[in-house]
């Protein structure tokens, strides 16, 4: 496994790869969710590239860029065990040199939910992913369903800019108690960690109501909110029942919908989602 920090050196390594190339973009501090993407990429491609880059342009001024967990030696050990071809781990100056000024604005799909709660977030995400696609030129790129809106943003960007990359979305990987795996879970103290299962419990509640025949959007949102309101440490940013294609809030679910939520547990903001299918 090669570890490369510069675009020039990476491009030389990429030129020597023949066959299908899969890309797994990450911000590091890897967990089993990331590794599930790596294994899927390994099964479907001749070569696998993992990028590790904590992207500053997707963090707001009051967000957790400075304390976002980082442990490159640990990440590299995990990836070595997965038999990855190349890890591309640039620094900020390599990705955003002096004078950098071009950003990708994806449009309406980036506006609601995470886009409303974190202004500028998806502008940063789309820009860095576009750059990584251009640098690594993969045939396929792998993302997790936990960041559902992000996957829609990246699909839209790839379509609109005619990027020759197949976007593959993989299932959420959960802890035994249902908490979606996230690098930010490390922020939680033991009491907060127990409370954090409220996100999964809220999704279970809305799925149960949906299976029982409830299709009213407000009633489904209320089912999630009731579970969150019963947890003293939980403070919701949003609960949503939205169209799976464009994320507009639904009055009534007629086919498929995305049930999603963002909740603060202490100072830690967590997200989760599930798909409701009629």
Curated annotation (Swiss-Prot):
Chain sites annotated for binding ATP: 27-34, 144-147, 173, 181-184
Keywords attached to this entry: ATP-binding, Cytoplasm, Ligase, Nucleotide-binding, Pantothenate biosynthesis
Keyword Cytoplasm: yes
Enzyme Commission numbers on file: 6.3.2.1
Top-level EC class as recorded in UniProt: ligase
Binding site for (R)-pantoate: 58, 150
Catalytic machinery residues: 34 (proton donor)
One annotated GO biological process: pantothenate biosynthetic process
A GO CC annotation given for this chain: cytosol
Superkingdom classification of source: Bacteria
Subcellular location(s) of the protein: Cytoplasm
Pathway given in the UniProt record: Cofactor biosynthesis; (R)-pantothenate biosynthesis; (R)-pantothenate from (R)-pantoate and beta-alanine: step 1/1
SUPFAM superfamilies (UniProt xref): Nucleotidylyl transferase (SSF52374)
Main subcellular location of this protein, as a coarse class: cytoplasm
Any one GO MF annotation of this record: ATP binding
InterPro entries in the cross-refs: Cyt_trans-like, Pantoate_ligase, Pantoate_ligase_C, Rossmann-like_a/b/a_fold
Catalytic activity: (R)-pantoate + beta-alanine + ATP = (R)-pantothenate + AMP + diphosphate + H(+)
Additional detail: The reaction proceeds by a bi uni uni bi ping pong mechanism.
Described function: Catalyzes the condensation of pantoate with beta-alanine in an ATP-dependent reaction via a pantoyl-adenylate intermediate.
Subunit structure: Homodimer.
Stated family: Belongs to the pantothenate synthetase family.
Protein name according to UniProt: Pantothenate synthetase
Organism field: Roseiflexus castenholzii (strain DSM 13941 / HLO8)
């Amino acid at each position: 496994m090669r570890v490369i920090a510069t675009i020039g050196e990476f491009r030389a390594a990429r030129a020597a790869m023949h066959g299908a190339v899969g890309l797994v973009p990450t911000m590091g501090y890897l967990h089993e969710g990331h590794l599930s993407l790596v294994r899927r990429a390994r099964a479907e491609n001749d070569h696998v590239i993992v990028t590790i880059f904590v992207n500053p342009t997707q963090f707001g001024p009051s967000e957790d860029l400075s304390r976002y967990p980082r442990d490159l030696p640990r990440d590299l050990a995990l990836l070595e065990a997965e038999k990855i071809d190349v890890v591309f781990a640039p620094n900020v100056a390599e990705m955003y040199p002096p004078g950098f000024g071009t950003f990708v604005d994806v449009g309406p799909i980036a506006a609601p939910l995470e886009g409303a709660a974190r202004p500028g977030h998806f502008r940063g995400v789309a820009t860095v992913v576009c750059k990584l696609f251009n640098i690594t030129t993969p045939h396929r790129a792998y993302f997790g369903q936990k960041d559902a809106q992000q996957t829609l943003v990246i699909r839209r960007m790839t379509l609109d800019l005619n990027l020759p990359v197949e976007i593959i979305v993989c299932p959420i990987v959960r802890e035994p108690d249902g908490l979606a795996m996230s690098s930010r879970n490390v922020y939680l103290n033991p009491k907060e960690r127990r409370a954090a299962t409220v996100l999964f419990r809220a999704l279970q509640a809305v799925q149960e109501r949906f299976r029982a025949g409830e299709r009213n959007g407000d009633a489904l949102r209320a089912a999630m909110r009731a579970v969150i309101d019963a947890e003293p440490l939980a403070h919701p940013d949003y609960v949503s029942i939205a169209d799976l294609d464009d994320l507009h809030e639904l009055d009534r679910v007629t086919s498929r919908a995305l049930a999603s939520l963002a909740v603060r547990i202490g100072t830690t903001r967590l997200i989760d989602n599930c798909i409701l299918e009629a």
